[in-house]
Amino acid sequence: MTIPRNLSILAEYAGTVNAPVLNLTNAGEVTTVSATAATGTINYDVITQSVLYYTTNASGNWTLNIRGNSSTSLNTFMATNQTVTIAFLVTQGSPAFYQSALTIDGNSITPKWQGGTAPTSGNASAIDIYTITVVKTGSATYTAFASQTQFK
């Protein structure tokens, strides 16, 4: 049996499910690698990738805008009680910069940061990985959990 590389499955259930719906031994995630410098507003399209990696040194602080894609809002893409986790990898030079704001579908959201405090700087000559988990709790209502991790 040949399984298509980009296989999408939608399963709907009536009643109670007592067993895991899906067990994965190994799953590959789509990564977009771009020779782009982080600055300004960066649109993160969850329909396109799970990981976005900017390989050119950041040139200014940025706002990360999470959305479905340019024509689909995250609100439309996600159902209430669904969660999506994304990773944004940012190459840093000296000076380093940081994510100064988070928006979802262009609307400001204050994430809950690991350790309780939002970053106020990037890490010079490193790669900073911003991991954000978004939980949709209602129509256009979200809770976001975020972290910044330095890699050298």
In which residue ranges do the predicted regions lie?
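Intrinsic low-complexity, repeat-rich intrinsically disordered segments enriched
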Residues: M1-I47
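Acidic, glycine/polar-enriched metal-coordinating patches/loops
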Residues: N57-K152
